[in-house]
């Protein structure tokens, strides 16, 4: 899981030729804490994707631009184009995330 140090590093992943999963989260979010332990398993099941953890509080303007108002949320891009999103305020399970990633 990549944790970008700044907006420029984060932006560089949007244009990637590979599928990139942006995982929007926050340290204070209990539903995000629930999913952290299984993220390595999810990443292992999707080796063709790059995973980028985005702290919504650090990148609030980006979250607003991308209409990320509930966390945890996932947005998948490739070559600057959004391929899919799993964005809502509900707690997400490993199975739900894997099912979503299988569709993009």
Annotate each PLM feature.
Residues 30, 58, 92:
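Short alpha-helical
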Residues 11-41:
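Local sequence-structure signature of Cys/Sec-based thiol-disulfide redox active-site neighborhoods
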Residues 76-104:
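Non-catalytic, surface beta->alpha helical segment in thiol-disulfide oxidoreductase systems
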Residues 1-20, 96-104:
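N-terminal leader/targeting and pre-domain segments
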């Amino acid at each position: 899981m990549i944790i970008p140090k700044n907006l420029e590093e984060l932006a560089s992943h949007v244009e990637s030729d590979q599928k990139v999963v942006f995982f929007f989260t926050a340290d204070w979010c209990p539903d995000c804490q629930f999913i952290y332990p299984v993220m390595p398993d999810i990443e292992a099941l999707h080796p063709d994707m790059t995973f980028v953890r985005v702290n919504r509080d650090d990148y609030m303007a980006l979250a607003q631009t991308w209409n990320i108002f509930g966390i945890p949320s996932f947005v998948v891009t490739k070559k600057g184009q959004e391929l899919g999103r799993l964005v809502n305020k509900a707690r997400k399970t490993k199975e739900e995330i894997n099912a979503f990633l299988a569709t993009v």
